[in-house]
Structures are given as structure tokens and as C-alpha cells.
């Protein structure tokens, strides 16, 4: 019995120059993403978005490689929850020796999550290793991790009618107030 060529199923993908080009392009993109890191600077603290995390966001389809924006947005949301300081209660050990918690403060850092997502996607597409601060919608003067006062503040006691000025954690001056 002899069968002709029409009986055999044709392969879905045939080796061709076009296919080789597509595979080469996809491999190049994968290598680019696998070698990319983004280091977020929070004063002396750094949070690194490494290539393993970035790789877990990649979606490979026939048309190419894309980044799962929801996964990237979740990463940014978690980072914002960790490092945002605006409206976060702060506890101080006062000059008079008591602890006081200040709530609803309007000073501090807040990551602009939408703008940060846009910037992060641009960083990833560049394929370069990046070190930078996140995009903020609100920022302070100085920070180290979640400490955005860095020992610089004015303390006022209305009961004692007294003011203390601290710079870099050291008392600079104090005075009575009325």
C-alpha cells in the first residue's frame, strides 16, 4: 500500500527563516529582561527588584513577550505599603521623657503608584539596570527607609510652654514660648 503526501498531517510550525528570526528576537527579549534589575533608593536603604521577580511577570504569547501589569502593580503597591510615610502615625520619645504618638500628619513620602508603574515599565523595556528613587506624589526633605525625619524636627509642649529644636538627632536649641 502506498500513501501519498496528502495523507500525512502537515506540521503547524515549519522551519523557516521567519520562524528563526522570531525565535531569535524572543530569546533576545528574554535575555534582556533576565539581565535587568531596578534598585529603589530610600535614603540609605535599597529595595532591589531582581530578574527572578521580573521574569515571573513575563507573558509569552505567539505575538511576543509582554509584562503582566497587574503583577507589577502589586509589587509597587506592596512597596508603597512598606515605605509610604505620609499619614502614618509617628511615636516620639519627648524631651520630657514621655512617649507621644502623632497621627494624621501630612508630612512624608507617598509613592505615586500609577506614575511609578509607567516608569517601571519604561525601565524594564530599556533593558538597563536602574538605580533610582520611586516616583513620589509627596516627598519630604530626607529619608532613611521609613524614617523621613532623620532626627530633624521641632518639639513643642503647650503644657510646659517650651520648644526644642533637633537636628540630626541632637538638640540644637530650646526656648520658652508663650
Task: Annotate each PLM feature.
Residues 1-178:
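Surface-exposed, secretory/extracytoplasmic low-complexity segments enriched in Ser/Thr/Asn/Gly/Pro
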Amino acid at each position: 500500500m502506498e500513501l501519498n503526501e496528502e495523507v500525512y498531517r502537515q506540521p503547524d510550525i515549519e522551519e523557516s527563516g521567519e520562524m528563526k528570526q522570531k525565535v531569535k528576537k524572543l530569546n533576545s527579549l528574554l535575555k534582556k529582561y533576565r539581565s535587568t534589575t531596578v534598585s529603589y533608593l530610600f535614603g540609605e536603604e535599597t529595595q532591589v527588584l531582581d530578574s527572578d521577580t521580573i521574569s515571573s511577570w513575563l507573558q509569552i504569547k505567539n505575538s511576543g513577550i509582554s509584562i503582566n501589569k497587574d503583577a507589577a502593580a502589586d509589587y509597587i503597591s506592596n512597596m508603597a505599603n512598606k515605605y509610604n510615610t505620609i499619614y502614618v502615625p509617628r511615636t516620639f520619645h519627648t524631651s520630657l521623657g514621655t512617649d507621644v504618638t502623632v497621627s494624621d500628619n501630612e508630612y512624608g513620602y507617598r509613592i505615586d503608584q500609577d506614575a511609578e508603574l509607567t516608569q517601571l515599565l519604561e525601565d524594564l523595556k530599556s533593558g538597563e539596570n536602574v538605580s533610582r528613587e520611586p516616583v513620589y506624589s509627596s516627598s519630604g526633605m530626607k529619608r532613611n527607609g521609613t524614617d523621613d525625619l532623620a532626627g530633624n524636627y521641632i518639639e513643642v509642649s503647650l503644657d510646659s510652654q517650651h520648644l526644642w529644636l533637633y537636628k540630626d538627632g541632637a538638640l540644637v536649641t530650646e526656648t520658652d514660648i508663650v
